[in-house]
Amino acid sequence: MLYFDAHACIGQRPQKHKRTRWSTEHLLEDMQLAELSGALVSHALAHSFDPIYGNDRLIQEIGKAPDRLFPVWCILPLGSVDFYSREREMLGAMEEADVRAVRLVRGNYSLHEAVMGDTFAALEEAQILTLLSMGWAGEDPFAFFHELLDRHPRLPVLLTDHVWSQQRHVHRLMQLHENLHIEFSAYQINRGIESYAAEFGDERLVFGTGGTEKSPGAARTYIDYAQLSAESKERIAGGNLRRLLRGQGPLIEASEGGAEDRCIAEARRGIPQSTFVFDAHAHVLPEGKQGAGPNYIMLGGDAAGMVEVNHWCGIDRIAMMSWHGPVCTDAEDGNEVVWRAMQRYGDEIVGVAVMDPTHMNDSDIRAEIDLRYREQGFVGLKPYVHMNLSYEDVGFMPWWAFGDAHRLYALMHVAPHTGGVAGVGRLAERFPNMSWIIAHAGGSYAFAEEVASCIVEHPNVYAELTLTPVTNRVVEFLVEATDDEHVLFGTDAPMRDPRQQLGWVLWADLPMASKEKVLGLNFKRIVDRALRP
C-alpha cells in the first residue's frame, strides 16, 4: 500500500530537545523504516522565522528526494509588508515551485475575514489545499472553524493537530462542512477511522504522521488494522492526498524491509499479531457506555468493545481499571465495573483496583482490599492525580503494604503534587517487593530521561509507554537507557485507540526479541510473580 504523509515538518526549531529528530535525513530514515512512499513537508523556519525565507529553504531540502518529498508553503495574509502583495504573485511563485498546498502557522495575525478574506478567496479559487492547526481555535474550536469554513465552502481544508478530547467539536464540523478533511496523527480516537468512514465516507480522511516528532509507524498502524476495505484503506493512506494535490505525490510503493521481523510482516498486512501482546494500561466504561461526560467520547468503550478491537490487531490480554474510578474518584463503583468484565472475559482481563483515601476511610480501604484482591483476584493498584494527594500520604500506606506483601504492581501517573518520579523511587525503596510502573514514560524525551534514571537506580521500577505524542524513537531510547526488560506496552484505551500505541512499538527500530519483551513478556512477568492472596 502506498503511504503518503500529509503532515510532516523538517528543519531547525526552537526549544527542541536534543534527542528530537528534525532533519531531512531523519525524516527520510523514518520514512524508510515505516515504509512510507512520500511526505508533504513544511520547513520549521517558515513556522518560527520568515515564511518566504523558510519556504526557500524547504525547496532546497526536498531536492534531496524530489520523488518522495513534496512542498507545503507557510503563508501570511496577502499585502503584508513581508509577504506577497497580490494573489497573482503568491500563486505564480507557488506554480513555479510546483507547490500545491499551504499552511497557515498560528501567530500574531488573525484569520478574520477582514485580514485573511482576500487570501482565502485566492486559495479557494485556485483549489489550494490549506492546512490549519487546531491551535488556531482557542477555547471554542467549533465556533472558530465553523465560521471560517462557512465563509469559504469550496476551500479544501486539512485540519491538523487536533486530539482525542476534541471529538465533539471535530465531529460536528465534519457533519456540517464537506470541505473539511482530517488526519489522525494526534486524533487517536477509539474506533474513529471506522466510524468516520461510515458516516462521512473515506474521501475526507487523510494519513498524517506529525513527523519528525511523532512515530510514523504509530500513524500507519491505525490504517493497517482498520476494519475497512482494501480500496478504502488505499484512499486514506495516500489516494485522497494525491487527489487534493491534483495528482502530485509519490508514484511507487516503498520497499518492504525487515523481512525477518514478524511483527512488521503481520502489521503491514493487517494480520493480528501472533506475538504475545499484553496491554499494561487500559480503562473501561460501564456496559453500553460511549463516553465519559461532557469532555470525552469513547466509542465502544465498554469491555466488549475493547476486547473486539484488541482482537482486530492481536492484543491478547489487557490490564484494566475503570475510567470513573481514578479520574472521577468513584473508586468502589469503578472497581465493580472491572470485576464484571473480569467475570465475563476470564484471564483475558487483569483487574486493576482503585483506592481513594479522600473518599474512603481506613476500614473502607481494608474492606475493598479484601474484596478485590483476596476474593476477586485483582493484581494491580492504581492511585491517581485527581485524588490531590502525595502518593506517600499515610492514607495509601496500608494499600502499599498489602501490595508489597503479595508482590503486586502499581501503575503510577505522576505529577509534582504526587511526589513525581522521585517519589516513586522512594516508594520502590520502601516497598521493594512491589513492581512500580511509571505511566506515560514515552510522552516526551525529557520525561523518558527522568524515568530511565529512576529505573537504573531502582530495578523494581518500570516504564510504561502510552501517550498521544507517540514520541519518535523514544521506545528505542528507553530500551537503550535501561534495558529491554523494563519497558512496557500500554494503550490508555478506550480514551485512545490501541492501534497507534501498538504501532509505536511494532515499527520501532528494535530486534524482534526486544519487541517481544516490550509488547508482552515483560508485563506478563510482573503479573505472574504476584502472590494471589
Predicted regions located by residue number:
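Active-site beta-loop-alpha junctions enriched in small/polar residues
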Residues: C9-G11, Q15, A44-A46, C74-L78, ...
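Conserved, mostly hydrophobic/aromatic
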Residues: H7, M31, L58, M94, ...
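Acidic/glycine-enriched edge-of-secondary-structure segments
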Residues: H7-K18, S42-L45, W73, T130-L132, ...
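Catalytic pocket-lining loop regions of alpha/beta-barrel enzymes
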Residues: R100-A101, N108-F207, Q376-G380, N388-F489
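A general structural detector for well-ordered alpha-helical segments in enzyme core domains, enriched
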Residues: S23-D30, G54-I62, R86-A93, D118-T119, ...
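Mobile, glycine- and charge-enriched loop segments
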Residues: M1-H17, N55, I59-I75, I264-Y296, ...
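Active-site gating/metal-coordination segments in enzymes
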Residues: S37-G38, S48, I52-L131, L251, ...
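Mid-to-C-terminal alpha-helical segments outside catalytic/metal-binding sites
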Residues: M1-I10, T20-G38, D202-R204, S215-F276, ...
